[in-house]
């Protein structure tokens, strides 16, 4: 059993999603958004750090998964996004959580089956995969999708490792 915290970073709205994985079974534990309504960036970063730390304390995840920075058209926005990611990662590392990063395209490909999927498609598939009564908020859905991606990637890595081990055992006999 593993608990995974997914984070969709943003300097104004940071989405989070928490799921439990038991084998191939995924269970929704919680999700939401950390909203920073103050204007100055240092105060927003402090709120993101405090919010992520509080979520980690509440859910006690085993793994921390976050979206990678993408190339934005606006350099200022990309820098702010990078700083928001940074404080979220520091919050995880301060709690000794292993950090995993996934590209947005990989997350969409894993959850929807199309790397260029729309936000509404991600919301719908997250709702379906986690058997939720309604679509989660967009940023929370993205965070849950990141957590789901981590589950699938880690599950596939374990299967590949088992296959290699079995292949090696077959050669030794």
Curated annotation (Swiss-Prot):
Give an example GO cellular component term for this record: Holliday junction resolvase complex
Q: Which organism is it from?
A: Citrobacter koseri (strain ATCC BAA-895 / CDC 4225-83 / SGSC4696)
Subunit composition?
Answer: Homodimer which binds Holliday junction (HJ) DNA. The HJ becomes 2-fold symmetrical on binding to RuvC with unstacked arms; it has a different conformation from HJ DNA in complex with RuvA. In the full resolvosome a probable DNA-RuvA(4)-RuvB(12)-RuvC(2) complex forms which resolves the HJ.
Gene that encodes it: ruvC
Q: What does this protein do?
A: The RuvA-RuvB-RuvC complex processes Holliday junction (HJ) DNA during genetic recombination and DNA repair. Endonuclease that resolves HJ intermediates. Cleaves cruciform DNA by making single-stranded nicks across the HJ at symmetrical positions within the homologous arms, yielding a 5'-phosphate and a 3'-hydroxyl group; requires a central core of homology in the junction. The consensus cleavage sequence is 5'-(A/T)TT(C/G)-3'. Cleavage occurs on the 3'-side of the TT dinucleotide at the point of strand exchange.
Q: What is this protein called?
A: Crossover junction endodeoxyribonuclease RuvC
Q: Which top-rank group of organisms is this from?
A: Bacteria
Report the locations given in the UniProt record: Cytoplasm
The reactions it catalyses are: Endonucleolytic cleavage at a junction such as a reciprocal single-stranded crossover between two homologous DNA duplexes (Holliday junction)
Which Pfam families does the entry link to? RuvC
Can you tell me which residues bind Mg(2+) 1? 8, 139
């Amino acid at each position: 059993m593993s608990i995974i915290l997914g984070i969709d970073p943003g300097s104004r709205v940071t989405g989070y999603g928490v799921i439990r994985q038991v084998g191939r079974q995924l269970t929704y534990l919680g999700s939401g958004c950390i909203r920073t309504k103050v204007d100055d960036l240092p105060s927003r970063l402090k709120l993101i750090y405090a919010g992520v730390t509080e979520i980690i304390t509440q859910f006690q995840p085993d793994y921390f998964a976050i979206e990678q920075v993408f190339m934005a058209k606006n350099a200022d926005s990309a820098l702010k996004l990078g700083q928001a990611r940074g404080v979220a990662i520091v919050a995880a590392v301060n709690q000794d959580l292993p950090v995993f990063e996934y590209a947005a395209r990989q997350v969409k490909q894993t959850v929807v089956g199309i790397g260029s999927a729309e936000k509404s498609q991600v919301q719908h598939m997250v709702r379906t995969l986690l058997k939720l009564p309604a679509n989660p908020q967009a940023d929370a859905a993205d965070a849950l999708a990141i957590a789901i991606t981590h589950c699938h990637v880690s599950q596939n890595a374990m299967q590949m490792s088992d296959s290699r081990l079995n292949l090696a055992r077959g050669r030794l006999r």
